[in-house]
């Protein structure tokens, strides 16, 4: 049996490490491997921590390995990184924050170079700014716009920052082959021969290390349950090496029917959420959020309003409901149509592709979200469902919406109605128009049978160019606005049908012209052949 060689501060854990087997190997071999790879070079480590069982097992393994090293060998930084999407399931995000703080505090006491860092999406890439601000539809399997913006990009930016400081980094993940076969295949494909490392699929100078990739779920829980059987006087059941306790994590899994965790996503090959896992409470990739439903049934009833809100968003993704909640125009200002199917006549009528959510629904949903936030805090749950920077960003998105510019500037009023107070709203320095201007413009536009939104966009363009000595590109911008689809869907479809008929006529005319040209060529060839035949006959007659 393998014995741990480097066991400097592991007196309470040494028997556990030397005697317990994981995936058919002594735990001592895994700890020694971590120590060997850690000491092999000066590349710092970035440990992805999602708060779930697998990432908790990885940080536990690394923590034990570092405890076993003499202080002089603990020279390399270990950055413990979690990704906060700002819409994480509340009980999960609370557990992550507390655990991260305890790990860093325990590491400081033990003299380990571990620091904790939380990354989050940039304000313009958050869930609410995109959904409520820009009107992006709730994510689905076919349009999962959230993963890259909210998870991949923040973690990638952190890794890139460390690469710029240290030239290279090693990213330590809790990926297991039994959890994600596709992820295991990707890592194996990029494996560096003769090492336990793999090249990152997208980030240069970043390398992947998966120390528990062969473990099964029982191995993970065995490590998290701890060494209490070997040191009953010093270590309690579920106690972790930094002085915390893993029982809340176990309880969380039990209360949610062991749904699993949402992994720290670092690239497209990492399985994202959407399969009844812990993750974003707003996730609509699945029909039902079974994890949250189970948590509510097992004592977290206060989260019921969040589940109801999430179910509302999921309802809007049903194909039969899309036309109700979503604009018929895309954010480009144009109506898009489905591509013709194989074998379908080009003249066949095609369905339009819905665009962003109507502004009126975004306004309604923002108010409902703020009411839920207010009520939960009044009940004693300290929670932020939407941040102030997000509210400011959403307001700007509404004011400058490409299809429905919010000249009424409704967001401050919505916030005031819910909270009976104002935020420090930015006053637009470009003479932003107000509700009275919008009312007047709508009234005048109706008399001239033009879309008031088009006139609003034209006026906004003029204001934005006011005072410039060179109004470069203004005609292109004017043309872009005028070429958008303005009017009702029926009017736009009538224009599209007329254009389609004209195109059909053009296509048919082109075909007729082509056939006539070919006919002329054939006729000419027939004439030439006939003339040639006559000449041959005359030559034959003269020869006789």
Task: Please provide the spans of the model-predicted regions.
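The Walker A (P-loop) glycine that initiates the GxxxxGKT/S ATP-binding motif of P-loop NTPases
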Residues: 49
């Amino acid at each position: 049996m393998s014995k741990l060689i480097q066991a400097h501060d592991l007196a309470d854990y040494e028997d556990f490490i030397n005697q317990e087997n994981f995936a058919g190997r002594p735990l001592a071999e895994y700890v020694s491997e971590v120590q060997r790879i850690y000491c092999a070079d000066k590349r710092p480590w970035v440990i992805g921590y999602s708060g779930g069982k697998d990432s908790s097992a990885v940080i536990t393994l690394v923590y034990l390995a570092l405890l076993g090293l003499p202080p002089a060998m603990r020279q390399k930084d270990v950055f413990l990184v979690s990704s906060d999407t700002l819409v994480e399931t509340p009980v999960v995000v609370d557990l992550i924050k507390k655990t991260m703080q305890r790990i860093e505090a325990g590491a400081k006491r033990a003299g380990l170079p571990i620091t904790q860092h939380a990354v989050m999406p940039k304000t313009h890439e958050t869930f609410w700014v995109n959904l409520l601000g820009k009107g992006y539809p709730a994510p689905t399997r076919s349009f999962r716009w959230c993963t890259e913006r909210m998870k991949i990009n923040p973690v990638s930016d952190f890794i890139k920052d460390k690469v710029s400081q240290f030239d290279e980094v090693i990213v330590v993940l809790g990926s297991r082959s039994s959890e994600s076969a596709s992820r295991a295949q990707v890592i194996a494909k990029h494996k560096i021969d003769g090492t336990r490392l793999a090249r990152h699929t997208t980030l240069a100078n970043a390398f992947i290390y998966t120390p528990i990739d062969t473990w099964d779920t029982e191995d993970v829980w065995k490590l998290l349950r701890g060494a209490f059987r070997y040191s009953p006087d010093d270590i309690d059941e579920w106690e972790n090496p930094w002085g915390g306790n893993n029982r809340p994590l176990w309880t969380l899994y039990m209360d949610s029917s062991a749904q699993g965790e949402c992994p720290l996503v670092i690239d497209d090959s990492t399985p994202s959420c959407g399969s009844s896992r812990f993750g974003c409470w707003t996730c609509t990739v699945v029909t039902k959020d079974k994890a949250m439903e189970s948590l509510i049934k097992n004592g977290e009833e206060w989260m019921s309003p969040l589940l109801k809100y999430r179910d509302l968003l999921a309802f809007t993704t049903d194909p039969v409901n899309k036309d109700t909640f979503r604009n018929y125009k895309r954010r480009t200002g144009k109506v898009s149509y489905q591509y013709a199917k194989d074998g379908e006549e080009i003249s066949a009528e095609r369905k339009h592709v819905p665009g962003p959510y109507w502004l009126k629904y975004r306004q309604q949903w923002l108010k409902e979200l703020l009411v839920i936030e207010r009520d939960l805090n009044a009940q004693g749950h300290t929670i932020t469902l939407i941040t102030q920077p997000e509210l400011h960003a959403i307001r700007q998105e509404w004011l400058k919406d490409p299809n429905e510019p919010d000249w009424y500037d409704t967001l401050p009023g919505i916030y005031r109605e819910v909270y009976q107070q104002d935020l420090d709203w930015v006053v637009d320095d470009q003479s932003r128009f107000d509700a009275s201007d919008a009312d007047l413009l709508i009234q005048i536009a109706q008399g001239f049978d033009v879309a008031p939104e088009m006139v609003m966009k034209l006026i906004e363009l003029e204001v934005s160019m006011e005072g410039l000595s060179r109004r470069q590109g203004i005609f292109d911008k004017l043309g872009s606005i005028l070429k958008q689809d303005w009017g009702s869907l029926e009017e736009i479809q009538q224009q599209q049908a007329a254009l389609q008929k004209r195109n059909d006529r053009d296509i048919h005319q082109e075909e007729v012209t082509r056939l006539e040209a070919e006919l002329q060529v054939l006729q000419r060839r027939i004439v030439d052949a006939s003339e040639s035949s006559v000449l041959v006959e005359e030559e034959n007659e003269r020869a006789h």
